[in-house]
């Protein structure tokens, strides 16, 4: 299931980026800044889920290089989002409230809740039985909700 999770997260990242740039052509900078920022969520998730060495069969030093590269990409996306937001989005308070109540944000909130439930099964919290399969299934559902969040970005 973890390889499927990684694929869903990478597709969500690509969807966020493609839709963000398509929306820029239509609506300008407000959704471009938002899309660049939220595209980091599934990308970070993919990095978290990917068992680099086991999946790719590479050395620990190469794994470190990939993690550093992924970190640089995240920093670049966040910096670009911040630059676009600070330079081109006005009024900022209105934009922030729009971001917080945007349908994409609502999907992200739901994904976070489902991901939290998966952690309860992983750790056996709240008197829940430990279950790796339920944890993985709930994570896949959460990541699919992130993919849907990218789809509703408009």
Which residue ranges define each predicted feature?
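Non-cytosolic membrane-interface motifs at loop->transmembrane helix junctions
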Residues: 1-3, 57-69, 127-138
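Membrane-helix boundary/juxtamembrane motif in polytopic membrane proteins
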Residues: 88-112, 134
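C-terminal transmembrane-bundle signature of multipass membrane proteins
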Residues: 113-125, 131-154
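C-terminal halves and exits of single transmembrane alpha-helices
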Residues: 35, 41-59, 74-86
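Hydrophobic cores of alpha-helical transmembrane segments in multi-pass inner/ER membrane proteins
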Residues: 5-18, 71-87, 139-154
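Cytoplasmic membrane-interface regions of multi-pass membrane proteins
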Residues: 19-26, 85-97
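Membrane-interfacial loop-to-transmembrane alpha-helix junctions, especially the N-terminal start
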Residues: 27-40, 100-111
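Juxtamembrane "helix-exit" motif on the non-cytosolic side of transmembrane helices
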Residues: 21, 50-59, 88-90, 119-129
């Amino acid at each position: 299931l973890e390889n499927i999770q990684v694929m869903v997260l990478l597709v969500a990242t690509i969807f966020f980026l493609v839709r963000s740039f398509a929306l820029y052509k239509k609506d300008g900078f407000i959704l471009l800044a938002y899309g660049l920022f939220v595209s980091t969520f599934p990308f970070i998730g993919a990095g978290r889920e990917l068992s680099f060495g086991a999946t790719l069969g590479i050395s620990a030093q190469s794994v470190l290089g990939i993690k550093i590269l992924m970190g640089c990409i995240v920093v670049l996306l966040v910096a670009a989002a911040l630059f676009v937001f600070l330079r081109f989005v006005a009024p900022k308070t209105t934009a922030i409230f729009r971001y917080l109540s945007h349908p994409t944000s609502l999907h992200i909130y739901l994904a976070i809740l489902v991901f939290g439930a998966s952690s309860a099964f992983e750790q056996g919290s709240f008197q829940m039985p430990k279950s790796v399969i339920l944890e993985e299934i709930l994570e896949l559902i959460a990541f699919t909700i992130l993919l849907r969040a990218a789809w509703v970005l408009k």
